[in-house]
Every structure is written in structure tokens, then in C-alpha cells.
Amino acid sequence: MLLILNGPNLNRLGLREPGVYGSQTLEDLERQCEAWGAELEMSVTCRQSNYEGQLLEWVQDAEEQGFTGLVINPGALTHYSYALRDAIAGQRLPVVEVHISNVDAREEFRHQSVTAAVCRGKISGLGFSGYRLAMEYLAEVLE
């Protein structure tokens, strides 16, 4: 059972910087993740919040809620949220960080991730396909 978390501003997909993030919406992404989950024979729950504390609680509670893996796009929290980093580090579940855009090809401040080091891996710049790759990886390691 996978938990897919999307952080701040990802509710604005399709509206915010379509040249960077594309024209598809968060709802489109969630539908795709659910379809990919069905192909992988894994149930998927998608959640989004603009609030750091809510994301922290979802990460902290994931295992006791029965989730076996976590895909997270922390949004801008990637670059400065040590609280989110610590929540991920304290989680026993495998976690993969995903970014729709290539953060290393963007502004300098986006090049640093404080969360990636405590994740199993980081996928960046592959659009929505990055979520699928993260899900495939988790399906493989959770077999």
C-alpha cells in the first residue's frame, strides 16, 4: 500500500508555470498514480497539503496506517525543511523523493535538497513519469 504525498503549490499544477510543470493538474497526476498502482497491483492513496505540519503528520503516521512505501514531492520544503527531513529519517518505510521539474537545471536555491539524503533515492525532471518510476521501484523492493 503506497502513500503519495505532494507538498506546497502542487495543488496548482496546470495553472502554475505550465512551461515548467506542464498543463496537467494534480487530479490528473493522482488518477495516473492510481492507474499505475492498479497495474502494479498496489493500492495507492494520494494526498496534498500546503502545510508543513500536515505533511509531517502524514509521514510520521504512514506505517501505523498500514502503508508499506512512500513517494514524496516535498515541493519547496525540499530545500529547507529539516523537520520534514527528520520525519522521513525517522520512518522505517522506504521513501522516494520525486520532482516533476529538473530542479538542478533551475534556480540555484533549488539545487539543494535537505530531504533527499534520507530517502532511498531521488527522481527529478521526468515529469509525472517520475512518480511511476518511484512506484515501480517501491513495488520491486517491497516484494
Swiss-Prot record:
Catalysed reaction, written as an equation: 3-dehydroquinate = 3-dehydroshikimate + H2O
CDD domains linked to this entry: DHQase_II
Alphabetically ordered keywords of this record: Amino-acid biosynthesis, Aromatic amino acid biosynthesis, Lyase
Active-site residues, record numbering mapped to chain: Y21 (proton acceptor), H99 (proton donor)
The keyword Amino-acid biosynthesis belongs to this UniProt entry's keyword annotation: yes
EC number: 4.2.1.10
UniProt-listed PROSITE patterns: DEHYDROQUINASE_II (PS01029)
Transmembrane segments: none
Residues the record marks as site: Transition state stabilizer: R16
GO MF term (any one): 3-dehydroquinate dehydratase activity
Residues where substrate binds: N73, H79, D86, I100, S101, R110
Swiss-Prot/TrEMBL GO biological process terms: amino acid biosynthetic process; aromatic amino acid family biosynthetic process; chorismate biosynthetic process; quinate catabolic process
Pfam families, per the entry: DHquinase_II
Keyword Magnesium annotated: no
InterPro entries per record: DHquinase_II (IPR001874), DHquinase_II_CS (IPR018509), DHquinase_II_sf (IPR036441)
Pathway(s) it belongs to: Metabolic intermediate biosynthesis; chorismate biosynthesis; chorismate from D-erythrose 4-phosphate and phosphoenolpyruvate: step 3/7
UniProt cross-references to NCBIfam families, sorted A to Z: aroQ, PRK05395.1-2, PRK05395.1-3, PRK05395.1-4
Family of the protein in this entry: Belongs to the type-II 3-dehydroquinase family.
Protein name: 3-dehydroquinate dehydratase
Species of the source: Deinococcus radiodurans (strain ATCC 13939 / DSM 20539 / JCM 16871 / CCUG 27074 / LMG 4051 / NBRC 15346 / NCIMB 9279 / VKM B-1422 / R1)
